[in-house]
């Protein structure tokens, strides 16, 4: 399921997004940067609890989360990143809403 609003698309990630996600997190300069491999694993094996915001063909947002198998009604949000050029537009909130829907 994709959620399009204007040129912004909110969707699940795929393995091809991992490099762009890594660069987005690196460029944020505020979030802990994991290895490129960690983002590949998130975009592939944990894609059901991760979200991409795409503006045009560019990844401008990423949300990663984890649902514990021991407590299925709890969602741990690990990272939320939005490109500096796209902040203050409600993208983080839209990604979280998409994930919870």
Predicted features along the sequence, with ranges:
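Acetyl-CoA-dependent GNAT
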Residues: 12-78, 83, 96-98
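Conserved GNAT acetyl-CoA-binding A-motif
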Residues: 101
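Active-site acidic-Proline motif in GNAT/NAT acetyltransferases
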Residues: 83-89
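Conserved N-terminal entry element of GNAT/NAT acetyltransferase domains
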Residues: 1-16
């Amino acid at each position: 399921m994709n959620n399009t609003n204007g040129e912004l698309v909110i969707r699940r990630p795929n393995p091809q997004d991992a490099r762009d996600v890594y660069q987005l997190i690196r460029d944020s300069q505020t979030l802990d940067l994991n290895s490129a491999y960690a983002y590949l694993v998130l975009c592939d094996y944990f894609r059901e609890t991760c979200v991409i915001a795409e503006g045009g063909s560019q990844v401008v947002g990423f949300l990663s989360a984890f649902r514990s198998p021991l407590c299925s009604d709890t969602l741990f949000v690990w990272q939320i990143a939005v490109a500096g050029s796209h902040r203050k537009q409600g993208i983080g909130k839209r990604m979280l809403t998409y994930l919870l829907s």
